[in-house]
Amino acid sequence: MTAIKGKLQELGAYVDEELPDYIMVMVANKKSQKQMTDDLSLFLGSNTTRFTTWLQGVLDKLRSVTPESNSMKTSDAIIFESSMPSLKSLSNSRDDLAKDVPTLTVSSTRHGRYDSSTSSHVQATGSSGSVARLTSAVKPLREFSPSEAVIDIKLDLDDPFNEDLSLATEIANLSRKRTALSASYRTLRPTAEVYRPPGIGQHAYHTNENNSSLHRFPQSSFVSGRSLKLQSSMTVGSSRIQDVSDLSETYKTAFRLASEKSLREEETSRKRRLPVASSVVKVKKLITDEEEVEEEGEEDEEGTDCIFRTAGISSSVSVPAKPERRPSLPPTKQANKNLILKAISEAQDCISKTTNYSTAAPQKQTVPVIPRSRLLPEEEQLMLLQNRSSLLNYPSHLQELQHQAMPEPLHKLDLLSRLQPNLEEEIELPNPVNSEEAEILRPLDSRSFILKRPKLSKEPSPQIQNNSVSPPCPAQPLPGRMIQPREAPTYEKPASPKFIVTLDGVPSPPGYISDQEVDESMCYTEQGETCVEQLGVVARPEQNYPMQLVTEPLCTNDVVMENTSSGTKEKIRERCKYWPACKNADSCAYHHPTSPCKSFPNCRFADKCFFIHPNCKYDAKCKKADCPFTHASKRFPVPPVKPVSTTSSSHPSSQPCRYFPACKKTDCSFYHPKHCRFNTQCTRPDCKFYHPAVSVPARHTLKWTRAQASD
């Protein structure tokens, strides 16, 4: 076998173990040189004749040196010995053979779907020319017991049934080769060790480097008991088979069984290629004894005939526990557990904390105005008594009021805080007593105000005197007007609480307002405090309106000014004619451009455009009336332009020009006849166009030149 492999490598035709095995099968079947040449021409090509000649010479030499003394063997027969040494004595037997004679050993084993049915190892004979013999040995993993029979198969050359037997064997081998073709290239790669629970059959493939041979024992290399018994019954010994028909039936049965076996092996190999979900696979590197563990799912009958299976129930399935999920990121990129725990603890602390907000902070609340709501009876009576007492005890001297002006805000604040039980509740308006007054005092708007809670004084308020309540405003100005004092206050404005009063007289909670907050219904005094404006109705004692202190009585010589809602006067929609030299700047009532004009120079508004045009380089000296550029300086009056007569331009004179066709005046007002396009080639006798006496040259012959500018 080694010699054949070496020769194939020399010829460059060695690919795998299939071809040497096929050649050994042909040698065993006693193929002639011509038959070998025909069969191997597909694989070897032009080297077929050279190889078959060499192989035939080797076989002839082996036949010639076969010893004649053996009576059980003929000189031209190939000897098939079935010797079964153990794995332990394998190296010793090889050493013994090497000591005796250099022999050419052919070892045949079955490989199932990985190789062909026969795996041979050929040891080349030495140059000494000593005797060599061809043997076929089946080497299992264990020794047979003495009770088991050893079958020696010897074929006679004169047997007429050798050709039929060779044909059946070749067909069976070829069918096994087809099924094993897909897996024949997986013998030399790293193997995968599949973990299974105990009880599942395992098979190992061992490589013995000392013997330079590979022994494979997959489960597919063993057939069922019926096949073994049937093939064992077809032994060809020294006794001839007499009945030809029985032998033919036996060959047909063997062929059919071989075909069925090949189909089973195909199905088994297909199932083995499917992924196994319950197996943990660990890839191992190649070692000296190559081991390949496969999951076998054969029938129970085949499992009982397998001599290499371990003890246990082959049909039991054990699924290993689900492995713990491991993170896909490397340890360096994984989150630190301490950081995660720290973040969780901080989050819990943040959630557990309660924020204490200061009660003194100003709070905003929206107070809807409810014009037709009623106060409680007790509050109604209290406010009525306060208003009556304030009217009866009005102070007569202005000096006393001025001395009491400074401490007054605190008293008013305490009074109003006591009059209003809860500032957080909505302010309610007392219902007027008479229906006529209700119709007169009906509010004109129902706006809501955003108010701020004032900081109440912590000191106990003194007893409120009668003069601490302000009287009603004696003057009732018209609605929509604002009364301003003639003189500015001589002292700094105190930080007193102020009140926002709506047009319908609804009292609002105290709050801080800025100087810019101006309401149309407010009447400002020196201290900036407000008093109620009523819509042309004289205040009566029975009406419940809160009054405030007025430090200076209103006089008739107060200036009454119109209240303007907008702070700035709207500009006139016309461009300032003095821009950009206008001295009023932003206070100018006219429009001053601020952005460049996008339609310049095609802007049709000229100097009236609301956008900036570039400056005119002539500025004040510009004489063009409709100049689109900007003129910063004042221009001199432009003399009126003499109007052009429209009759000459729109309706030219019917009198022909006497200089035609030599007239060079572009704006000539006389009649210039139109040239005929056909010129002198015109054939119409009644053509109304002009036909020059001298023919005008063609257009393509004329050359246009630029006229030289005259100095």
Swiss-Prot record:
Zinc finger (C3H1-type): 570-595, 596-615, 616-631, 657-674, 676-694
Residue ranges, annotated region (Disordered): 108-127, 457-478
InterPro entries: Nab2/ZC3H14, Znf_CCCH
Main location: nucleus
Keyword RNA-binding attached: yes
Subcellular compartments: Nucleus speckle
Keywords linked to the UniProt accession: Metal-binding, Nucleus, Repeat, RNA-binding, Zinc, Zinc-finger
GO function term, MF aspect, one: pre-mRNA binding
A Pfam family assignment: zf-CCCH_2
GO biological process, one term: mRNA stabilization
The keyword Flavoprotein appears for this protein: no
Coiled-coil regions listed: none
Domain of life: Eukaryota
PROSITE patterns named in the record: ZF_C3H1
GO cellular component: cytoplasm; nuclear speck; nucleus
Signal sequence coordinates: none
Stored SMART domains: ZnF_C3H1
Compositionally biased spans, kind Polar residues: 460-470
PANTHER family: ZINC FINGER CCCH DOMAIN-CONTAINING PROTEIN 14
Annotated family: Belongs to the ZC3H14 family.
Subunit-structure text: Homodimer; facilitating circular RNAs (circRNAs) formation.
Function: RNA-binding protein involved in the biogenesis of circular RNAs (circRNAs), which are produced by back-splicing circularization of pre-mRNAs. Acts by binding to both exon-intron boundary and 3'-UTR of pre-mRNAs to promote circRNA biogenesis through dimerization and the association with the spliceosome. Also binds the poly(A) tail of mRNAs; controlling poly(A) length.
UniProt protein name: Zinc finger CCCH domain-containing protein 14
Naturally occurring in which organism (per UniProt): Xenopus laevis (African clawed frog)
